[in-house]
Amino acid sequence: MTTTIVLASPNYAANESKFATSLAKFQANSTDASHQRDIHMIDRIAGNLASLTVNAYDRGLLFLDESTTLEEIKAILPKLFAAVHPGAALSVDGVFAKELADAFERESLLAGWMIESKGPFVLRRPAQVEAVPLKLSTKKSAGASVGVKLDFLFKKPEKQNTLSKNDVLKAAQEEEEGEDDLYDEDALVSDEETQLGKDVLAPPSTCSKPGKKKRCKNCTCGQREQDEAEAAAASAAAPKAVKLTDTMEIDFTELLKSKNAVSSCGSCYLGDAFRCSGCPYIGLPAFKPGEQVLISENRDKLSWMADDL
């Protein structure tokens, strides 16, 4: 009896007439009268919702359509490879998406399949090949041992030093003459040039050390004035705090318009629970986008427009 594992995409199996015709076509090619099929959906096998028995099937059928994704192909090809017997074939039927044609061939090879045909695809699991042990000879040939012995017999003597006394004295004189040609680097620079370099490179004694933020009281390098100018500019650019008294009222409408209050999160109209800590609408009740809201809190009525939301 021939056992067949069938994997089909849900869309392919939904067309019952097409699915039955494809199964009958592949069954007609089988020479075995008795036939057993196990049918599974691709998405369930790829999602590990169902499993396949290892080495349990004589052949495999794979029905794909354009809805099949590359992730599903990567997941099912190794599982089909393990489910069929060594030497079994996997026939593929259906229409591929254009970008999956080359990907299917690559993933088939990575899963271990051999590609027998590409139109349509027919894959085959390679048959198992038993390993044959090889006996390695440990005997040494006579020529090899003789060669080793001859190598020691005809070893070349080491080269000895044959320099005469005259050559040694001549080399010593040349070395002394070469030392006389060296120059003292300190002699190349005068004392005035050395003192000038120290004055240029040394920082002023009254200046602060690098990285120190606080300047000296008697700073003469201009850093103190520069820091004061930067601090004054920063304080001028900072918004001034509004001071309120018991008899003073503030118009929220003018404040919101002067600051160009614009909602960046889009949730300001929902109320304080949905507003960030820096929201210009903090303290105001919820309102509808674009709606004019009037509030009375025992003082003059305040109004504003939420057109910027």
Curated annotation (Swiss-Prot):
[2Fe-2S] cluster binds at C207, C216, C219, C221. [4Fe-4S] cluster binds at C265, C268, C276, C279. Its cofactor is [2Fe-2S] cluster; [4Fe-4S] cluster. It is found in: Cytoplasm; Mitochondrion intermembrane space. A motif (Cx2C motif 2) lies at residues 276-279. Residues 1-132 are annotated as: N-terminal SAM-like domain. InterPro entries: Anamorsin, CIAPIN1, Dre2_N. Belongs to the anamorsin family. This is Fe-S cluster assembly protein dre2. It comes from Schizosaccharomyces japonicus (strain yFS275 / FY16936).
